[in-house]
């Protein structure tokens, strides 16, 4: 399968200059500091190199301790509008999804036209301001180590104005760009224009144009910048990928956010534990089952695992023929109503619940048949309608109707969402038909035979599946095994007319995409995509080539992952129905854990779970950062999705019940526990030693007034500042 090669090019403004100053916006008070999160806001005076914070500021940030931390924690962060992608194709060059780009031109060939491919345009100034995710906050507010792995700020990209760069590897590249630019200024060297000198044709800056003081200052800053880069590179573990630097940074930042959330209230602690246990890939303690449970499991282990569990006999006729296939692939007495619903097949937010109601609860078969007809995939890959419907009905039968959320309704919703994301204008003509087939098929099978419990539950109970897959992505591996095994059933092989090479490639892609739906891999997926996009933003070549399997599957994996986490981006009516279903499934798992005498998983206890708060946390820490990154890739096509997401988040925030104040003694205990959880010590600086003493105080006492951030336990977004007078005994004549 061949298709025109697609590239993503970053185009620079014709008026970009080679060097520009940077300014830092930090929230300081004249007499007091505010405790919170800082956010670097560099503004370009003129473009040409990636703007970074001054080295002196970065070095002081790296070495600082939480004492006297003069930083502010904004409750809302202004949205930096993201670049768009315009798509064209390169007719003279072909991309083979199995083999990569056609020979004859290097992907990094500077003669390659930047106007042909995926072009990252500058941001549109008219876009409304929107909250940014926690990824754009400082990651070192309370970092005591002077060897922080990443910058303490977010950085604007070189050719995209205020697009902030947050991934460590892209920040190192940006810093090296500044070093190179400063070197040309200091040495007055001017070579022929090349991909690293986009502004080489500008008037040269001569050595004498810099005063001696400015020259020495620039030389010292350049040396310090280079030292910073070396310091970062020396700490990189050679067996780690550069995107793992971003993954570790994001995990560290999320852990800090969750720590804050857990300290606010009991319900916040439960939400924090749920997000941490579900979306962070870490080794959890395995709960040892009771002896009676061991006896039950022992009987299961005695069965030979020679077959894939979950595969059952057909519950429908396998003798379908083309003449018996209905218009929508399913029998229905409500064809007109179903046709009306399917008019939204290509729209974000199709009501899949109505489709299920009009299709005799066959939403997956109906949606998949409609998508394959819409995309002409049946004809392209020579799939007979009867074989396709037979397989889809067999697949749908292997979704459990008694599971509240992870059933065929969810699979149909993810498949339709993937179909819409593949059709986004920014990605038009980017993916081959085989890749499209693989993505939609992966979405359809990604939760087949889901038992309605989590991977950790299966591991803790020593289930047969956990033993078979060695506790690694247990359910995701099982979904793949069942999905592919069903192709071997009678009249079910929808890929029988693919070539051997196509089948192998499709299988590899589907496996990669379904394994990516393991929520514990979320941070790695997010970091991979963000690193890829930001790295190409800061490189002078400005070209993101989707000409190899790794880059292309990375986009597809994140696409299916986005579709899997798309409920909060749909209309509030649909979102609330999905929320009710997932909470019902969680509570059913909690009941099973209670019956077994196990510790109940976070958000699975129907007596204590805070549904509204869990959805706000889910959006803030998981869904928003993911869709924000996806919007970076397909700007401006995802703006409406982000708007809906923010509206839904605000609605759930408004629905959080206001808890009454606890008794005084209980509040005292909570405060004591909160203080014990703090991982840093707050030290306030001494007031001017010549200041007036308070009446009744001796010379060994001083008064210090500082501004602290007081956070509402039920609403972190509302902050108020309170002046606190603290009397402290001065035991030293030296300022602390």
From Swiss-Prot:
Domain PDEase: 330-659
Keyword Nucleus found: no
Presence of the UniProt keyword Cytoplasm in the record: yes
Binding site for AMP: 406, 410, 447, 564, 615, 618
Catalysed reaction equations from the record: 3',5'-cyclic AMP + H2O = AMP + H(+)
Gene3D superfamilies: 3'5'-cyclic nucleotide phosphodiesterase, catalytic domain
Binding site for 3',5'-cyclic AMP: 406, 615, 618
SMART domains registered for this protein in UniProt: HDc (SM00471)
Protein name: 3',5'-cyclic-AMP phosphodiesterase 4B
């Amino acid at each position: 399968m061949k298709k025109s090669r697609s590239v993503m090019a970053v185009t620079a403004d014709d008026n970009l200059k080679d060097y520009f100053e940077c300014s830092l916006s930090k929230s300081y008070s004249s007499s007091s500091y505010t405790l919170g999160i800082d956010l670097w806001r560099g503004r370009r005076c003129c473009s040409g190199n990636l703007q970074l914070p001054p080295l002196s500021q970065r070095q002081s940030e790296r070495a600082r301790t939480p004492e006297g931390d003069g930083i502010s924690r904004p409750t809302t962060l202004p949205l930096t509008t993201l670049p768009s992608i315009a798509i064209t194709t390169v007719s003279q060059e072909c991309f083979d999804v199995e083999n990569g780009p056609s020979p004859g031109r290097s992907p990094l060939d500077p003669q390659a036209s930047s106007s042909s491919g995926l072009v990252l345009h500058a941001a549109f100034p008219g876009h409304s301001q929107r909250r940014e995710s926690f990824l754009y906050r400082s990651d070192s507010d309370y970092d005591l180590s002077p060897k922080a792995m990443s910058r303490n700020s977010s950085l604007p990209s070189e050719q995209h104005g205020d697009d902030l760069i947050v991934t460590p590897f892209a920040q190192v590249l940006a810093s090296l760009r500044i070093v190179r630019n400063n070197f040309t200024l200091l040495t007055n060297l001017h070579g022929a224009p090349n991909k690293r000198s986009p502004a080489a044709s500008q008037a040269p800056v001569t050595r004498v144009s810099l005063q001696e003081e400015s020259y020495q200052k620039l030389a010292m800053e350049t040396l310090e910048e280079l030292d910073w880069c070396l310091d970062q590179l020396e700490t990189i573990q050679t067996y780690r990928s550069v995107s793992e630097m971003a993954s570790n940074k994001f995990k560290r930042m999320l852990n800090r956010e969750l720590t804050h959330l857990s300290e606010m209230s009991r319900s916040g602690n439960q939400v924090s534990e749920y997000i941490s246990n579900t979306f962070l890939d870490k080794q959890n303690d395995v709960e040892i089952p009771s002896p009676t449970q061991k006896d039950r499991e022992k009987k299961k282990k005695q069965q030979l695992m020679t077959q894939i569990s979950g595969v059952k006999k057909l519950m429908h006729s396998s003798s379908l023929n083309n003449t018996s296939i209905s218009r929508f692939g399913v029998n229905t007495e409500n064809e007109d109503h179903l046709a009306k619903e399917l008019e939204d097949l290509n729209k974000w937010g199709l009501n899949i619940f109505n489709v299920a109601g009009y299709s005799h609860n066959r939403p997956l078969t109906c949606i998949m048949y409609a998508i394959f007809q819409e995309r002409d995939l049946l004809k392209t890959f020579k799939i007979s309608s009867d074989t396709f419907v037979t397989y889809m009905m067999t697949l749908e039968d292997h979704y459990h109707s008694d599971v509240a959320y992870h059933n065929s309704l969810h699979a149909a919703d993810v498949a339709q969402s993937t179909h819409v994301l593949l059709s986004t204008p920014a990605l038009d003509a980017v993916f081959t038909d085989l890749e499209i087939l693989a993505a939609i098929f992966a979405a359809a099978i990604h939760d087949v035979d889901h038992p309605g419990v989590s991977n950790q539950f299966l591991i803790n109970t020593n289930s047969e599946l956990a033993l078979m897959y060695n506790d690694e992505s247990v359910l995701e591996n099982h979904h793949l095994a069942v999905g592919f095994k069903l192709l071997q059933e009678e009249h079910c092989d929808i890929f029988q007319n693919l070539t051997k090479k196509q089948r192998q490639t499709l299988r590899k892609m589907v496996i990669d995409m379904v394994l990516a739906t393991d929520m514990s891999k979320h941070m790695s997926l997010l970091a991979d995509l963000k690193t890829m996009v930001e790295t190409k933003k800061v490189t002078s070549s400005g070209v993101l080539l989707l000409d190899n399997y790794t880059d292309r599957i990375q986009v597809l994996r994140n696409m299916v992952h986005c579709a899997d986490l798309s409920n909060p981006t749909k209309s509030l009516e649909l979102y609330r129905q999905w929320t009710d279903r997932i909470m019902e499934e969680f509570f059913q798992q909690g009941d099973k854990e209670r019956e077994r005498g196990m510790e109940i998983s976070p958000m699975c206890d129907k007596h204590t779970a805070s549904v509204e708060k869990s959805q706000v946390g889910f959006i803030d820490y998981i869904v928003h950062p993911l869709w924000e990154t996806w919007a970076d890739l397909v700007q401006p096509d995802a703006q409406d999705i982000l708007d809906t997401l923010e509206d839904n988040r605000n609605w759930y925030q408004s629905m959080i019940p206001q808890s009454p104040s606890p008794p005084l003694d209980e509040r005292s205990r909570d405060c004591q526990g909160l203080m014990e959880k703090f991982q840093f010590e707050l030290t306030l600086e001494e007031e001017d030693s010549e200041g007036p003493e308070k009446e009744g105080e001796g010379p060994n006492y001083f008064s210090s007034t500082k501004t602290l951030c007081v956070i509402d336990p039920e609403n972190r977004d509302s902050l108020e500042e309170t002046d606190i007078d603290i009397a402290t005994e001065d035991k030293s004549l030296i300022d602390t």
